Each structure stands twice: as C-alpha cells, then as structure tokens.
Curated annotation (Swiss-Prot):
Binds 2 magnesium ions per subunit. Its cofactor is Mg(2+). Substrate binds at residues 18-22, 30, 34, 62-64, 66, 68, 186, 192-194. It comes from Leptospira interrogans serogroup Icterohaemorrhagiae serovar Lai (strain 56601). The gene is uppS. It comes from the Bacteria. This is Isoprenyl transferase. One of its GO terms (molecular function) is magnesium ion binding. GO terms for biological process: polyprenol biosynthetic process. The active site is at 17, 65 (proton acceptor). It is an enzyme of class 2 (transferase).
Amino acid sequence: MGLFESNLPKHIAVIMDGNGRWATSRGKSRSEGHREGAQAIDRLMDASLELGLKNISLYAFSTENWKRPVTEIRSIFSLLIEFIETRLDTIHKRGIRILHSGSRKKLTRGVLDKIDFAVDKTQKNKNLTVNFCLNYGSRDELLRAAQELFLERKRSKVALEKPLKEKEFEKFLYTSILPPVDLLIRTAGEQRLSNFLLWQSAYAELYFTDTLWPEFDKNSLVDSLKWYETRTRKFGGLTNG
C-alpha cells in the first residue's frame, strides 16, 4: 500500500457526516442511518489497529446537535449506550483506550456512567486511543479552558497578566494527552470544520471525501492515508530548496 509507519499521522480526527443522507437515499429512518454509522466506527477501529494508527478522534455529537429533533437525539444516545454495552469487552481485549472529549452538561447520568465506565476500564490500553467527542464544540472547549486557566492562576496566586504560553493553555484542553491533529477527514462531501478541534487542527491536513460515513471502510481510510503521504507539511515555514 505504500504506507510506512514513519509517515502515518499520529492523530486523525474524523467528522462522521452523512448518516442521515445515507438513510434517506435508501428510504430508511435517520436512526437506522446512525446505527449503520456505528458499524463504520467498528470498521475504522479494526483498520486503524491493522494499519498501526495510534490516535483517532471522532465527532460523535456536537454542542449544536441539540437543535435536532428530540427523537433523533434520543436515538443517538441510545445507540451510544448500546455501542458501549455490546462492544466494550472486545474493545478492551484489543487494547483500545477510550477517551471522552466534551461538556458533561446536558448529558444524562446514565450516559455519563457508561462513558466513565468505558474510560476507566480501558485507561491502561496502549494499542489505539479512540477519543469520542460527545457534546463537544471547539469554541465551548476554548472558553472552558480559558476559564479554568484563570481559576488555576488565581488559586496558585500567579499574576493574571503573566504572559501565557501555549503549553500552559493546552493543559486545560480535553485533548491534553493527545498529539496535535495531523489529518482531519470529513465524509459526505461537505468542506467545513463545523467547530471541531479548531486549536488541535491548526496545521492539520484536511481531507474531504464524498463517501457517506456509513460507507466508509478500510479502503476509504487507506485512500486518505495515501493522500496524506503526498502532502508537504510546512507548519508555517518553507520547504527545503
């Protein structure tokens, strides 16, 4: 495949778009589309392990998604609970670590308990980290981080006007233990970031595919990695020569 471990992105972020369109095009309900999208997450985890990827962040539910119909929201969270209940043992045995990025506000006690259990059970796993961004919005994250930094400086009696360094700020991000995003994939043809990991994706390569999320498979992932290999990453500088 021409993929070498040294060239693999250390952190891939995925905007999983197209569940609804997949369902509508087949005369199915949006809930059925989300269920099929959960199968695509399984395929992504399998392929990531096989290819040697280490960190994946998935945009599962945004802070803006609360505007959707109540029935659809209930279906999404019901699927999340089912996903954890039916797959967690296998995920754990395969050495996959689960993380959660996002606000805990608005999430029910039942959902939080399932997430916390999955995070706690898999915390020592090292083969692959899958970060579920649930009730996540990048602006919300940055505001929360700024507030926590302010409170921390106040508690520590550090002068508030002291110049702020990136590393100090990043400690308060949900993704503080993850490397920056190298590759951001968005499915279903849309070409926008939708308030997803804006700080973390500052120098990410952006890969847009028309493939709907329920149809995303190992070949789709390999295509994105081959494309990533062709990119010259400058990080604001110049290429040699």
